[in-house]
Amino acid sequence: PAPQTSIELFLIVDHSMYAKYNSNSSKITTTLKARVNIMNAIYSSLNLVITLSGIEMWSAADLITVQSSSRNTLKLFASWRETDLLKRTSNDNAQLLTATNFNGNTVGLAYLKTMCNSKYSVGLIQDHSAIPLLMAVTMAHELGHNLGMNHDGAGCSCATCIMAPVLSSGPAKSFSDCSKHDYQSFLTIHKPQCLLN
């Protein structure tokens, strides 16, 4: 079995999402906590615990330029985390949640094998569904990329697996054997220190 690991996850709510929830910060907080609870259920099979280390809402204005290019937005967010967020608070990974509609059918984006990196341990999430499970799966999927998981391909096809290339609406949500193998390899080769404290 995988060693016990923990991730301190920090969530940023951009201005578009803040407005989408009618500037109701307590409702947003409740919503995000529920999603993280589901993420923990998903990740329990990997013996990994996710702690919500903080939530910051960009209630007045965005602190980066959130744009329809998910790639550009993720790049800006990565730089902002390193130069701003980490100067104020410690976390292992940060996700930016937005109501912005990205180009194409993208609902999330993250760097691969970057967990614990001060700049690139980030993910970008479009608030695309009112269904908590689907949002938790999207967040878990992008976090999976940070943890070294590739999309499920031939040989590990699994329609309702977390790392399927396309989000399925099916209820069964688990990691494929390929994802588990990718994660184990990441732990062994990269030895991400922040997960082991």
Curated annotation (Swiss-Prot):
A Pfam family per the record: Reprolysin
Protein name: Snake venom metalloproteinase acutolysin-C
Any one cellular-component term (Gene Ontology): extracellular region
Cofactor: Zn(2+)
Disulfide bonds: 116-194, 156-178, 158-161
Keyword Transmembrane: no
Coiled-coil annotated spans: none
Amino-acid positions noted as binding Zn(2+) in the UniProt annotation, renumbered to this chain: 141, 145, 151
Enzyme class (EC, first level): hydrolase
Tissue-specificity statement: Expressed by the venom gland.
Source organism of the structure: Deinagkistrodon acutus
PROSITE patterns the record matches: ADAM_MEPRO (PS50215), ZINC_PROTEASE (PS00142)
Active site per UniProt: 142
GO molecular function, one term: zinc ion binding
Signal peptide: none
